[in-house]
């Protein structure tokens, strides 16, 4: 067996290398694992991009070397995320190694080099004694979201309708089924009512992150998500690239907000990325806004999204 590897933590030109898989590694090898290669007599780290049985004819087998070491048994970029990586590189004209940087924390390679990449078993306790009561309209909408066959839903709501209660009910449902959920909110509202309300209901052990969180803490949360310890994640657009093991719903609040479009290399649109994740997996996508974007409304009109409304204002 052979594999393609792409550079991790280094800037190379647009290429990948072909290496042979030693027979001792064949049973344990997976796409997305980090491997060690001595390149030009230097220790470098790469990610397995593709595995194949037969070597391409244009490559001389005698020139192919073997991987030195698999540095971590866990695959941080599973098969469908490799497809997502390819999509980003092609759709946004981004070199593959630049796109890869979206999927792995900056200091991960340093932990790999030092042999300090160890998962800590962290127990997350989510539920409080508080109950989440829905109005008749909210309960009806919740059931419709769950039963809807179209995985992609656009929720058009009015101010005062308390759509956060719908979010909580959805997160609670998937948590009880031991599944992972992701709620994306704009950077500017990370400390707003949504985050506070969710903290009050699920306690403070759910993951809530923003750009002020340190790289070390991001890596810690990265490992918690990969190991399935963390079930509920609230974050900005970059959370889409984290290694969820069993992600069943992505909720994007204020989907019209410009902060979902990255202006840094590699540039990307988080709404498009979330759509692609839904296409590549079983994940349901819920886009919510009181002023939906033109693109989202167009998709709803053309049945790419199921359009649902929440126009009833909540009364205490």
PLM region descriptions:
Residues 1-291, 296-297, 301-315:
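Accessory, non-ATPase domains that flank or precede helicase/AAA+ motor cores in DNA-metabolism machines
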């Amino acid at each position: 067996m052979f594999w393609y590897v792409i550079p991790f933590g280094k800037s190379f030109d647009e290429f990948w290398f072909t290496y042979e898989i030693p027979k001792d590694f064949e049973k344990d090898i997976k796409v997305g694992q980090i491997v060690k290669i001595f390149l030009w007599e230097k220790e470098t780290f790469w990610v397995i991009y593709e595995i194949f049985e037969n070597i391409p004819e244009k490559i001389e087998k005698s020139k192919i070397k073997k991987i030195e070491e698999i540095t971590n048994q866990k695959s941080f970029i599973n098969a469908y995320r490799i497809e997502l990586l390819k999509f980003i590189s092609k759709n946004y004209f981004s070199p593959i190694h630049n796109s890869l940087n979206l999927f792995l924390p900056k200091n991960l390679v340093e932990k790999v080099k030092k042999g300090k990449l160890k998962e800590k078993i962290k127990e997350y306790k989510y539920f409080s004694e508080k109950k989440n009561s829905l109005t008749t309209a909210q309960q009806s909408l919740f059931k419709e979201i769950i039963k809807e066959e179209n995985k992609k839903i656009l929720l058009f709501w009015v101010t005062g309708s308390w759509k956060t209660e719908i979010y909580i009910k959805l997160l609670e449902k998937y948590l009880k089924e031991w599944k992972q959920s992701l709620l994306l909110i704009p950077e500017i509202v990370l400390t707003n009512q949504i985050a506070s309300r969710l903290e009050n209901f699920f306690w403070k052990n759910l993951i809530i992150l923003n750009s002020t969180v340190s790289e070390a803490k991001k890596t810690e949360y990265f490992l918690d998500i990969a190991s399935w310890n963390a079930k509920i994640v609230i974050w900005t657009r970059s959370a889409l690239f984290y290694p969820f093991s069993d992600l069943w719903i992505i909720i994007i609040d204020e989907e019209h907000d410009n902060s979902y479009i990255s202006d840094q290399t590699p540039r990307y649109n988080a709404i498009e990325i979330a759509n692609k994740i839904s296409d590549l997996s079983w994940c349901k996508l819920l886009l919510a806004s009181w002023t939906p974007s033109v693109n989202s409304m167009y998709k709803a009109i053309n049945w790419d999204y199921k359009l649902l409304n929440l126009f009833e204002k909540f009364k205490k």
